[in-house]
């Protein structure tokens, strides 16, 4: 299929990937209008499977189908980890979600990491002597 640049409808895929879950949220370019929203917990039964790459892949393909039904043909991708004083690296589902969106037939524009990084952080929980286990 050949499209002119004017005909292609772009969207933004916000992928939040932690070590507990993966959330895929597809919006229009402004980010104001939600097109599709799914998570790893919506597609698997067991809680322990929520953060898995397989759950992220299923969630991404479900979100991709909903977005294509709404006419979106191309995506910019924003990947986010918990950040702040949590982990600064995305969880195991981020890579699988990006790959599933690409396989679904979208044109992929920019892939960007939007993890919030503190410039001078708030104090970590646990106190002066740390968490005593």
From Swiss-Prot:
Keywords, ordered alphabetically: Ribonucleoprotein, Ribosomal protein, RNA-binding, rRNA-binding
Which superkingdom? Archaea
PROSITE patterns in UniProt: RIBOSOMAL_S11
Which GO biological-process labels does this protein carry?
Answer: translation
Tell me the GO molecular function terms. rRNA binding; structural constituent of ribosome
Q: Gene3D superfamilies given for it?
A: Ribosomal protein S11 (3.30.420.80)
Is Translocase there in the keyword field?
Answer: no
**InterPro entries in the record, alphabetically?**
Ribosomal_uS11 (IPR001971), Ribosomal_uS11_archaeal (IPR019961), Ribosomal_uS11_CS (IPR018102), Ribosomal_uS11_sf (IPR036967)
Q: Which Pfam families match?
A: Ribosomal_S11
GO CC aspect terms: ribonucleoprotein complex; ribosome
**What's the subunit arrangement here?**
Part of the 30S ribosomal subunit.
Name the protein family.
Belongs to the universal ribosomal protein uS11 family.
Q: Which HAMAP family match?
A: Ribosomal_uS11 (MF_01310)
| Biological role stated in the UniProt entry | Located on the platform of the 30S subunit.
Q: What is this protein called?
A: Small ribosomal subunit protein uS11
